Design a protein with these regions (language model features):
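Acidic, low-complexity protein-protein interaction segments
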Residues: 91, 96-97
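Short, Lys/Arg-rich flexible segments
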Residues: 1-86, 95, 102-158
Length: 158
């Protein structure tokens, strides 16, 4: 939601900006525990949906704070307030038994790849994307509920 404040009354603009900032902080605080539970559910489904050979890829699935994520997972170009500051990733910078970084292996399993013979294609199993899709509506409901709760407090105060 965008809001343009263009008024010259006696402190009204400052009061509104302060209240909007307070609402934003309250929504973020309200979301903290709910999102932690939501991420755990996504993680559990990603692990359950991950194809298992040795189990190394499955055991590498984890939730990380977005600010500490590997560079290729950094989100840029977005404006606005960050409400979800975590991401779910699989793989690591460690090498697997073939000397290939696990991150590349995770991408190949998740997104698919051409087999070594060059004649067949492994279609991939998007276990991370599917786990997020399973819980997408739930996330939308969590965000809407937290926003509605905070805005109802504001209307009660007025």
């Amino acid at each position: 939601m965008s809001m343009v404040l263009d008024e010259t009354d006696f402190g009204g603009k400052v009061k509104i900006k302060k209240k909007v900032s307070e609402i934003d902080d309250n929504i973020k605080e309200s979301l903290k525990d709910r999102l932690e539970i939501w991420w755990r559910e996504v993680l559990n489904d990603a692990i359950a949906l991950c194809p298992v050979d040795s189990g190394a890829l499955q055991s590498s699935i984890r939730i990380v704070d977005a600010s500490y994520a590997p560079e290729q997972f950094q989100v840029t170009g977005e404006t606005g307030n960050v409400l979800v500051d975590s991401i779910i990733i699989a793989g690591s910078s460690a090498l697997n038994n073939d000397g290939v970084p696990c991150m590349q292996y995770a991408l190949a399993v998740h997104d698919g790849h051409v087999m070594r013979d060059g004649k067949s294609i492994y279609m991939g199993v998007p276990f991370l994307a599917n786990a997020l899709l399973i819980h997408e509506a739930e996330l939308e409901a969590i965000l809407a509920d937290a926003t509605d709760e905070e805005l109802s407090k504001v209307t009660e105060e007025s």
